[in-house]
């Protein structure tokens, strides 16, 4: 009979009192974690900015609004800005004065500068926005200048050889936004408004010819280079302020998501 008494003791030890102090649920009413949303203001830039690292490039005719958009995206999303290398280009003014003499030289200059941009973008550990793509030069400007007689067959072939060699291992944009402005008058008005001295000689026919090449450029980007492209008609939309600005930023955010 001593054995049953030994069994009863363990039962009394495992009695419910110990679980009762499981007043550990008391800490659960700690609604402290929900306060973490207060950290959201870290995104002082814009809450809809893409979270992962992105390389976005902007394409479009001269005066289409790429520079304005690139600066705005840099400020709104916190992207590193890579401006079009126009201001520092030593051949640009001569080019618009005598296109036949300076077209090949200018295209090589732009190619070298844009490849340098791509190398820098590869080393930057944040999202980047580039004002004008590397691909517009071989697919639009070089072909157009050759068609106008400003580049010889030999110069065009040599340019493409340089392009193939220099762009072989560069990082490509994740996405490209192509700005479309059908009206040459709007382009000319924007060019005059920004007042770059070296662009004063740009004529209506030159811009109209470029527009023809930009029509097929998005398809070339996707099929030849495997880069996704969003086409935006910005002829009448003012993306600098108000509702136009918000709609533009929302479109870009959705495109990059």
Question: Where on the chain are the PLM-derived regions?
Answer:
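Long, basic/Gly/Ser/Thr-rich N-terminal segments
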Residues: 1-42
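NTP-dependent small-molecule kinase module
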Residues: 2-11, 188-257
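Phosphate-binding P-loop
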Residues: 46-53
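Hydrophobic anchor at the beta1->P-loop junction of P-loop NTPases
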Residues: 58
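P-loop (Walker A) phosphate-binding loop of NTP-binding proteins
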Residues: 61
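Conserved lysine of the Walker
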Residues: 66
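Conserved substrate/cofactor phosphate-moiety recognition/catalytic segment
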Residues: 71, 75-114, 140
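A glycine- and Lys/Arg-enriched "phosphate-lid" helix/loop adjacent to the NTP-binding pocket
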Residues: 139-213
